[in-house]
Amino acid sequence: MKLLLLNILLLCCLADKLNEFSADIDYYDLGIMSRGKNAGSWYHSYTHQYDVFYYLAMQPWRHFVWTTCETTKGNKECYKYIINEDHNLNAQQLNNIKNLDKQDFCQKEYAYPIEKYEVDWDNVPVDEQQIESVDINGKTCFKYAAKRPLAYVYLNTKMTYATKTEAYDVCRMDFIGGRSITFRSFNNENKDFIDQYNTNTTSKCIIDVHKNNVNTHLAIILGITDSTVIKSLQEKLSVLSQLTTVDGVTIYYLKGDSYATDNIKLKDLKYETLVKYTAGQGQVDPLVNIAKNDLFKMISDKKIKRGTMVVLMDNALGSEFNAETEFDRKNISVHTVVLNRNKDSKITYSALKLVSLGPHYHEFTSNSEVSTTIDELFKGIRANLTERCDRDKCSGFCDAMNRCTCPMCCENDCFYTSCDVETGSCIPWPKAKPKAKKECPATCVGLYECKDLEGCVVTKYNASCEPKVKCMVPYCDDDNNLKEVCKQKANCEADQKPSSDGYCWSYTCDETTGFCKKYKHGNLCTGKTTNCQEYVCDSEQRCTVQEKVCVKTSPYIEMSCYVAKCNLNTGMCENRLSCDTYSSCGGDSTGSVCKCDASTGNQCKCNKVENGNYCDSSKHEICDYTGDKPKCIVSECTEDLVRDGCLIKRCNKTSKTTYWENVDCSNTKIEFAQDGKSETMCKPYYSATCLNGQCVVQAVGDVSNVGCGYCSMGTDNVITYHDDCDSRKSQCGNFNGKCQPNGDNSYSCVFEKDKTSSKSDNDICAECSSLTCPADTTYRTYTYDSKTGTCKATVKPTPSCSVCEKGKFVEKCKDQKLERKVTLEDGKEYQYNIPKDCVNEQCIPRTYVDCLANDDNFGEIYKFYLPCQAYVTATYHYSSLFNLTSYKLHLPQSEEFMKEADKEAYCTYEITTRECKTCSLTETKEKVEEIDLCAEETKNGGVPFKCKNNNCIIDPNFDCQPIECKIQEIVITEKDGIKTTTCKDTGKTTCDTNNKRIEDARKAFIEGKEGIEQVECASTVCQNDNSCPIIADVEKCNQNTEVDYGCKAMTGECDGTTYLCKFVQLTDDPSLDSEHFRTKSGVELNNACLKYKCVESKGSDGKITHKWEIDTERSNIDPKPRNPCETATCDQTTGETIYTKKTCTVSEEFPTITPNQGRCFYCQCSYLDGSSVLTMYGETDKEYYDLDACGNCRVWNQTDRTQQLNNHTECILAGEINNVGAIAAATTVAVVVVAVVVALIVVSIGLFKTYQLVSSAMKNAITTTNENAEYVGADNEATNAATYNG
């Protein structure tokens, strides 16, 4: 049992992604177990420190399966540990399970991998006091951040990374995306239960482990050159020689400007062999492509079944791979081993693109991790060489670990099922004798068969039994008499609940249509007196009233303290504590007064809460909120009496039901100006209505356009009509308004076009339209409406990446190309083009380009290299800032990418030598051709040459072998008729050709160019008297701190074409320069706020020097705040500006306000001048705020505004003092709020309905500030309650 992972483990069918589970087992897996619909309890043993799932009500999926191997006295034995609660054995038989033939305990068909979830300690507070506590099922649990796919995990123990322990239970898991799994109560489990459970349900099953059965070829790319780890790697890679199905190994490594390969036997994969290969520095992309092609050819030729590639690398790749299309579909498995000392995300990102499965990726940072990393590599390769999935036979799908899996969790209404790993389909379980969930006996009607999702259905009717229409069904008086003649009856069920018309109906079969139709009904359903009653139909279609029956739901099923009750207010069933008959009725406390947890000994107990006011339903008490204060009253009704705006709930004592009364506003007087027009014109537009419990006069229509004018209500509540048509101008066209009579004796203000105007509707409307490019009639057409003086527009979709120029939409990206030039081997410039595409409304260079394509863009280059394209490496360079995720999600690229995208899109071409053949200029130096270097040597000197390891050497079978690379020729002399053969020095060497090659290459590179740095880094070296290859010495290309090349720096690489050291131009990136010059200029590399530029100068002696200066235009040295209510600083890590909101507290800025008064206000920064202003809270979902006449804050329950949530404070006025002057003197809306509140506090009196004025002013202030894009609203009651708790 100790193998059940000490980390947080969970199995949940719904949590799986399709490709994340398998129905097979092998000893390379972490572990696997079965699943069911219903997650069970979690048990954690403190004594043995292991986790156990205990499944409840899960048939037959109550199984754990995990595998392991043990070596005893030199014998390796692999077995499965199985927990199986549905088997045919007794406890005694479990001890002898190996020797039992007929047993269904050790089944493998129902096995799925467990999932491992972990706490994200990096995001857990180090201070235990900061860890949030949560009540879950009556238990106090603690919230911890968790790694994907979880968002949070809740444990019953409070701990930090420093104090973490294994002694915890899991309460709940929250998944990213919103799904949660809550674990059931498990207070009664103990060690005895666990021991008994293990004894009866757990056993060890011996298995035959799947042997490796896939023959493969191993391609190893040596791309790690770090001297501190290379020896350990070479020693540890010998472990791969234990792979039993590998038929050969090919080593690939960079060598100079080219590469080298060598084929070795698997047994020679050891340190003594690998030490012979010295890998060059650089990106291994070309080697990956070459190895991929080599392996794919072996697969195509049926020499191997699968290719295996191991990529050792310590540099980011120069290009991006698609693992699925480039490797998986070609049956090649790629495994990466990455040395990433500084955890560079760019290296990780590019290396991950090579693999399609997490276990195939291995990253380490130091020499101490080499052994563990290569062991994991070995396990990953070995697991992948066992094939249990044939794509031609698997009806499910082959997952990433090459196993046939079922497309979903197996569920069937008729049989217990499992996943058949051979076919990937769900089959009855177990195979030998399937267990049926439902039996379907034969009757006189016919033969029945159980079908998934349907149940028992007739598969074959007996004679005269098949129904004539859908609504008839055959039956027999005696089901056991299979010879009885069938009878037919209507298959129409009567109502169990009343229909929508309020009656209970029975139904009969309409033999014409085949559908059921209404037949008879009983009495009308009446008599419900509470929400917890419901209407039910009996067999005689009589409607009766019954009390609702509630049933406990998960996770409360096993909790004895909880019962299912109907809520009288809502009519909904709830899981509530059995002793809880209390409901809140005002007061300071709104929580429950009852508990059932460890503090009450897991018994249901209720205690009065201080300052709480609760009504007891067992005493027929309800809460009456309709008076001045909420109070409990004994009532015949069961619902609380509340006020809701203009409605008041009352109790009918006779019927024992509640009803609503409306506030009557029919007698409210509406006043009009006595001018003979106002009442006639405006009366239809105003009426009296109830608002916030008061009768007010409100407009009920659009009063801004009444007849030829408008209506308005003055401060004296008198309504007046204003005729202003003649002074109006149309919104579009600026036409004069004219009052015209309508056919119904009414009048309208119209705006006819000037008869003298020759402008069309499109011309008129384009001038007042807010659309982009309004005058482009291809995409915008208009119609002028004289009744409103406005225009209606018809808009067509505009082209992508278009802008408005001279009134027309112009497609900016259409047919755009970047013109590029490149100088090729003949010294001529060739032009090529890189097309640009519109992607997500951005015009960017095409993301993929074939730089050797035979098309209009690269045609000239294609023709030039056509004779020998096999030796040309064409690379498309693209900006490293390109975000592939944004591209796939149809999101725009960053501004930084757009700035450099065009500049960073170009092609490079490089000629390489393979097997002593290369691409070279012809004698005319106008074309290139394929040449065999060894054939040239033979032709020129008459001495036979052969190719070995990409170098030309004199044929080993030639009689006159060279001495110290000096070429000798055969001389035949004759004396006395006897011929004598001797060797004579020719004065030539095997180095001559390569020496000339170096000389010509440097000459061609330097010719016609000035100011080129020339540091030679390659020469010929005589090897074994015969071979004379070009050897690069990269040490010469390491930047010397004493040498200043100006704004250029050595890259540490030797150019394989020119045999000179490569230089990089220094412009704005000091990280490319040596530390000596960075320190000399005071460069801060870790400060992203500072950007630099390289400045070059020339001394009187002609010597060029350089230094780094801060580029003030690009640097973010002194960021500015966007408004007066924030400060701005630069983040030195990202270089981004950080804006911090200015904060203020009510108690500090307004010390004269008491806590009770301050409960309604929060302190806010003014966007006008940055000063602090007092602002009243707006309404929230839970709370509503106002002030009494003394300025005291009143917080009301939003759903019941008669219920005050804070302490009530009596207001006693000394007298009425008019405070209008203080308000009138205020200059801004925000200051009005301050003036009103301060006046209330200092004078200790209030204005009538002052809180309405304050609230209105506050809302206006927020409306104004919302126009500022950087405005962020407060958290309403949360912020204020934290400051004032009085």
From Swiss-Prot:
Q: Which domain of life is it from?
A: Eukaryota
Q: Where in the cell is it found?
A: Cell membrane
Q: Which residues are tagged as glycosylated in the record?
A: N200, N331, N384, N462, N652, N883, N1197, N1207
Per the record, membrane topology reads:
Single-pass type I membrane protein
Transmembrane region(s): 1228-1248
Residue ranges, Extracellular compartment? 16-1227
Q: Which Gene Ontology BP terms does the record give?
A: cell adhesion
Keywords from the UniProt entry:
Cell adhesion, Cell membrane, Disulfide bond, Glycoprotein, Lectin, Membrane, Signal, Transmembrane, Transmembrane helix
* Regions of this protein lying in the Cytoplasmic compartment: 1249-1286
Gene Ontology MF terms in the entry: carbohydrate binding
Residue span of the signal peptide, if any?
Answer: 1-15
Q: How is it modified after translation?
A: N-glycosylated.
Q: Name one GO cellular component term.
A: plasma membrane
Q: What does this protein do?
A: Lectin which binds galactose and N-acetyl-D-galactosamine of host glycoproteins and thus mediates adhesion to host cells. Mediates adherence to host colonic mucins, an essential step for pathogenic tissue invasion.
Q: How does it assemble?
A: Heterodimer composed of a 170 kDa heavy subunit (hgl) and a 31/35 kDa light subunit (lgl); disulfide-linked.
User: What is the protein's given name?
Assistant: Galactose/N-acetyl-D-galactosamine lectin heavy subunit 2
* Organism of origin: Entamoeba histolytica (strain ATCC 30459 / HM-1:IMSS / ABRM)
Specify the taxonomic lineage: Eukaryota, Amoebozoa, Evosea, Archamoebae, Mastigamoebida
